[in-house]
Amino acid sequence: MPSLEKITTTPALTFDALTAGAPGAPLVLLLHGFAESMHCWRAQVAALADAGYRAVAPGQRGYSPGARPNPNNTAEYHIDRLMDDAMAMVAACGYPDARFHLVGHDWGGSIAWALADRFPERLASLTVLSRPHPNAFNRALQLPDGEQARRSRHHTAFLEPDAADVVLADDARWLRERLAAAGVPPEAIELHLSVLGNREAMEAALAWYRARGAIRGPLGIIEVPTLYIWGDADDTVGRVAAEGTTDFVAAPYRFEALPGVGHFAADQAPDRVNELLLQHLAAHPA
């Protein structure tokens, strides 16, 4: 069973994390997105530990109360800081120089792509759920049909000054309905709300969007073995962006489209995600 641990990277930053598996075993770092939390990986953390890995799924900057700089200072939430956090947590877990496996969903996927671009020598494998390679995403955004732009319009809504109030109003009705409509089980929704269902956490989570940084910035060609998982019912990422990701990976690459699965695949289809993830990691050992 996963346990809740604290990971301190600097005197000012202590992250909550779901962990399982023996320290020193091959490391798998799992990065969540919005509007979920580290709890989206609970099934993967358990399965990875059972398979002999050390799995660490942190509550990232702003989501962990001990790692929540002032969200009004958006520089503290730039993607470079989020990348720094990930690498610092790897070191704090006892893997300062070792290669490790990286998994990301949504915003965590954006960080994962950027880390694979910057530190390919540190990664044994890359697995991304939902979020396509940024270059494929940008290309789809620019198409005249406007499909991907429509799917991404929530990014603009999250920049509004009252966005946190809107999302949390009426017992977080928007958030509950958003997750439920995407097939997230009720018990998982409550876990995510235990992290995000307060104004301090929500303002910090939305600061990621306000900082923007490299979420849409171009990256290089990825040279890390990559598994990309996309649900064909994902309302935030269209097929053009998803299928176009292959153009930006120059390493062993596997694209898996999950029929009927939405944006939150780890919560909606945990067994299938576990199966694909374990196959990928076994094929590319650290």
Task: List each model region and its residues.
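Flexible "cap/lid" subdomain of the alpha/beta-hydrolase fold that forms the substrate-access gate
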Residues: 2-6, 13-15, 39, 56, ...
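Short strand-coil-strand connectors
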Residues: 10-11, 32
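Short acidic/polar mixed-charge low-complexity motifs
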Residues: 11-14, 25
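Conserved HGGG/HGGXW glycine-rich cap/lid loop of the alpha/beta-hydrolase fold
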Residues: 18-68
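Histidine-centered active-site loop/cap adjacent to the catalytic His
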Residues: 273
